């Protein structure tokens, strides 16, 4: 069997890659021509060995040369192994190693081979260092998303249970909190569903991979939708705040329906096409790797657009806020401090931090820049939900006032109930009309008008945000 000229060229290029790996480590080795000759001799010996061997009578995986190593016939439901190919420039380091591959129950070879024992050991040191960094980043974002999930759930309950906090602004906050929670839950669930085969791909590891593949891809789709919804709700926050400060008139309740449609409907417009194209043209593994960058840009482009629009809204809001502070004739130091505080408050709400590394694509991020981009984005994205819940719920003056009022009413109801249980029956008849067990006298000074609602002026809304 002869090798075509095109295949020879491809093989020479791949073998040059092996030489480059060796050159990077500072070792001596053969030229590309010598390495190709060694590979060609290894291939011929493999074919001669397989031709001389007698095929097994029963079901078995066929012996073959997979362009890397020579495989003998293998029994079904077993893990075959072959010695590391001797044409490798670093073969003397890995002579005792093996390449592993699964032979399925149907007599077909599995898709994956494990050649980690045959890799250049000097090259593996850099790989292990990178893997350690990625594992630490995963621990960091797991802690961040878990903390965000817990605080967001509590903030969501507070904004939902206290009726006096119900207004368009807080309805949008509730949906934003929900999108952060869905994003955190989806990412944490995806990590659980993503199989992690060990260095030796045995029967059990491959079976677990095949069983979890469908669930893992489903989790990947849900994750992409939740991430997209999170960005669109950040955009809704920016559009709503900008409309309060710039636009005049209009029904907030009517606009809220459009906000709902934008926040939860827009992500489907780019996630569904991505799923279709990915299934047709890059249906590999768990869809966690993006080898075809054009397909990944179907999702990346709308997200970058939301980041850019929110950044422009952020700049516009800062300009409006600065003009308002100056018209109040505040001292220079006072309005600068107020502007700085408002800026830091708006950054997590609008996701402005995303613009720092937005121009840097995955293709451009290499080496230290790649890890700097990953660390910056992963840290802020995972803890962003926690920051938003703290800034716009837990330390919000309206929320704190309502919690104190609710706690005061709860204690008052409890004390009234205890007093009424101790009084004789005639004491109940002496109570004023309209009072009774479990009822709390209300004060007109605590009317709902004391809290900013949908009809308040834009300046008061800005105060509540900043």
UniProtKB/Swiss-Prot annotation:
Keywords: Cell membrane, Disulfide bond, G-protein coupled receptor, Glycoprotein, Membrane, Receptor, Signal, Transducer, Transmembrane, Transmembrane helix. GO terms for cellular component: membrane; plasma membrane. This is a receptor for GIP. The activity of this receptor is mediated by G proteins which activate adenylyl cyclase. GO terms for biological process: activation of adenylate cyclase activity; adenylate cyclase-activating G protein-coupled receptor signaling pathway; adenylate cyclase-modulating G protein-coupled receptor signaling pathway; cell surface receptor signaling pathway; desensitization of G protein-coupled receptor signaling pathway; endocrine pancreas development; gastric inhibitory peptide signaling pathway; generation of precursor metabolites and energy. Residues 22-138, 190-217, 279-293, 363-377 are extracellular. The keyword Chloroplast does not apply. PROSITE patterns: G_PROTEIN_RECEP_F2_1 (PS00649), G_PROTEIN_RECEP_F2_2 (PS00650), G_PROTEIN_RECEP_F2_3 (PS50227), G_PROTEIN_RECEP_F2_4 (PS50261). Its main location: membrane. CDD domains: 7tmB1_GlucagonR-like. InterPro entries: GPCR_2, GPCR_2-like_7TM, GPCR_2_extracell_dom_sf, GPCR_2_extracellular_dom, GPCR_2_GIP_rcpt, GPCR_2_secretin-like, GPCR_2_secretin-like_CS. It is a multi-pass membrane protein. Glycans are attached at residues 62, 77. Belongs to the G-protein coupled receptor 2 family. Residues 427-466 are annotated as: Disordered. N-glycosylation is required for cell surface expression and lengthens receptor half-life by preventing degradation in the ER. One of its GO terms (molecular function) is gastric inhibitory peptide receptor activity. Residues 1-21 form the signal peptide. SMART domains: HormR. May form homodimers and heterodimers with GLP1R. The chain crosses the membrane at residues 139-161, 170-189, 218-242, 255-278, 294-319, 342-362, 378-398. Disulfide bonds join 46-70, 61-103, 84-118. The gene is GIPR. Residues 162-169, 243-254, 320-341, 399-466 are cytoplasmic. It is found in: Cell membrane. This is Gastric inhibitory polypeptide receptor.
């Amino acid at each position: 069997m002869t090798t075509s000229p095109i295949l020879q060229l491809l093989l020479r290029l791949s073998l040059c890659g092996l030489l480059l790996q060796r050159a990077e480590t500072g070792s001596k080795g053969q030229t590309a021509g010598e390495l190709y000759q060694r590979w060609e001799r290894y291939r011929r010996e493999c074919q001669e060995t397989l031709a001389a061997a007698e095929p097994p009578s029963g079901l078995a995986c066929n012996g073959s040369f997979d362009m890397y190593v020579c495989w003998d016939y293998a029994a079904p439901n077993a893990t075959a192994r072959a010695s590391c190919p001797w044409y490798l420039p670093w073969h003397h380091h890995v002579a005792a190693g093996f390449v592993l591959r699964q032979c399925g129950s149907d007599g077909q070879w599995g898709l994956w081979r494990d050649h980690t024992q045959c890799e250049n050991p000097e090259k593996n040191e850099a790989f292990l260092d990178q893997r350690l960094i990625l594992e630490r980043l995963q621990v960091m974002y797991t802690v961040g998303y878990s903390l965000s999930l817990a605080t967001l759930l509590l903030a969501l309950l507070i904004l939902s249970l206290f009726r006096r906090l119900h207004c368009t602004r807080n309805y949008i906050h509730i949906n934003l909190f929900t999108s952060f929670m869905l994003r955190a839950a989806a990412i944490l669930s995806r990590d659980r569903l993503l199989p992690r085969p060990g260095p030796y791909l045995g029967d059990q590891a491959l079976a677990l991979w095949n069983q979890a593949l469908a669930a893992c891809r489903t989790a990947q789709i849900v994750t992409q939708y939740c991430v997209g919804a999170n960005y669109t709700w950040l955009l809704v926050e920016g559009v709503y705040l900008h409309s309060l400060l710039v636009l005049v008139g209009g029904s907030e309740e009517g606009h809220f329906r459009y906000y709902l449609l934008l926040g939860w409907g827009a992500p489907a417009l780019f996630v569904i096409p991505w799923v279709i194209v990915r299934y047709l043209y890059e249906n590999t593994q768990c869809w966690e790797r993006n080898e075809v960058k054009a397909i990944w840009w179907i999702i990346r482009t709308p997200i970058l657009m939301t980041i850019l629009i929110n950044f422009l809204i952020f700049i516009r809001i800062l300009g409006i806020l600065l003009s308002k502070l100056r018209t109040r004739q505040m001292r220079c130091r006072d309005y600068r401090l107020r502007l700085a505080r408002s800026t830091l408050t708006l950054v997590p709400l609008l996701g402005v931090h995303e613009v720092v590394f937005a121009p840097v694509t995955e293709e451009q991020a290499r080496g230290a820049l790649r890890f700097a981009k990953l660390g910056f984005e992963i840290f802020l994205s995972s803890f962003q939900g926690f920051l938003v819940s703290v800034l716009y719920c837990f330390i919000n003056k309206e929320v704190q006032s309502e919690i104190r009022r609710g706690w005061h009413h709860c204690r008052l109801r409890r004390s009234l109930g205890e007093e009424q249980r101790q009084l004789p029956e005639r004491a109940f008849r002496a109570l004023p009309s309209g009072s009774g067990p479990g009822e709390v006298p209300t004060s007109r000074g605590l009317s709902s008008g004391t809290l900013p609602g949908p009809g308040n002026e834009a300046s008061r809304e800005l105060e509540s945000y900043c």
